[in-house]
Amino acid sequence: MQLANLAAIVANRGYYYIPHIVKKIEGRDSLDARFYERHYTKVDPKHFEPIVEGMWRGVNVGGTSTLARLDGWDVCGKTGTAENPRGRDHSTFLSFAPKDNPKIAISVYVENGGFGASAALPIASLLEEYYLTDTIRRPAMLEYVKNLNIYYPAYDK
C-alpha cells in the first residue's frame, strides 16, 4: 500500500490522500472526511516533473516498462527487481495513468517473480487497463499472467 501511495505522490506531483483499506462504500458521505483531504509532502512540486517524465519515457519511448503501454493513455511506470539470496528475485512495478490528471496509481510486488517486467508489470498493466477502459484488449498478456509460475520455496532455516 505504501508503494502505491508513493506512485500516487509522484503522479499528483507531491500530494497524497491517507491510504486506507475499505471494506465497503455506502455512498461518498460514508467515508471519513480525512480520507478526502490532500496532504502535501515537503518536496517542491517542480522536482516531480523529471521523475514523471522519466517514468513516461520508460513506458512510451524505451526501457524495461514498454509492455505497460496502453493505446490512448499516457502511462507512466517503473520496474524494479529486488534481489533475493534465497530464491528468485522479487518483481516490482509502480505505475500511474494518465500522465496528467491521473486517475489510477498502482504498485505490484511479486515475491519470487523475477525481473520487474516479467511478473509485476503485466499484472499491474492489466489491472490498470481494466480500470481505465473497463475491458482487457491484450488477451496474450492476460494468458501470460494466468500462466505465470510464481512459486514460494520452502526456505531453509
Segments (PLM) and residue ranges:
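Active-site beta-strand/loop architecture of penicillin-binding DD-peptidases
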Residues: M1-H39, K46, M55-R138
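Short, highly charged C-terminal tails/helix-capping segments
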Residues: R138-K157
